[in-house]
């Protein structure tokens, strides 16, 4: 299957927010063949890299991240919004269009594995703020984020540039616009 079929499976919802084309992944994950292909692309990329954990960003990142962790036979680490993790956490604030928010990770998320190799997964990268905060969280508890992978990259919003100082970026489908 080519990447165009994956791109074609993503529904574009115009003006979901005024002036925004929302990339709806529910049509992708609802198509078993396409969903499997996305996970296979990611599995093939990471299966020979000695990755220790997959970390994923709430909520849509969990869909792809947990499936990938299962396919690789490694642990899955959720990165969640404030108040959603029940044990000791650390947080990282990030800027939104109209304010700030914060993400949390358990302080023991990587099971005391020194310098664990982690791949960060999310469904989409736009401006990169959420991903940047997530990479900082991963690093702050002693792991290394070897790459951040996204199903969709909205190139026009330049999120890759925000992540460049911290990690490499991989995406399956790219859209030039915003």
From Swiss-Prot:
Disulfide bonds: none annotated. GO terms for biological process: adenine salvage; AMP salvage; purine ribonucleoside salvage. Its main location: cytoplasm. Pfam families: Pribosyltran. The keyword RNA-binding does not apply. InterPro entries: Ade_phspho_trans (IPR005764), Adenine_PRTase (IPR050120), PRibTrfase_dom (IPR000836), PRTase-like (IPR029057). The keyword Cell membrane does not apply. It catalyses: AMP + diphosphate = 5-phospho-alpha-D-ribose 1-diphosphate + adenine. Keywords: Cytoplasm, Glycosyltransferase, Purine salvage, Transferase. One of its GO terms (molecular function) is adenine phosphoribosyltransferase activity. GO terms for cellular component: cytoplasm. It comes from the Bacteria. It is found in: Cytoplasm. Pathway: Purine metabolism; AMP biosynthesis via salvage pathway; AMP from adenine: step 1/1. SUPFAM superfamilies: PRTase-like. Its EC number is 2.4.2.7. Belongs to the purine/pyrimidine phosphoribosyltransferase family. Catalyzes a salvage reaction resulting in the formation of AMP, that is energically less costly than de novo synthesis. Homodimer. This is Adenine phosphoribosyltransferase. The lineage of its organism: Bacteria, Pseudomonadati, Campylobacterota, Epsilonproteobacteria, Campylobacterales. The gene is apt.
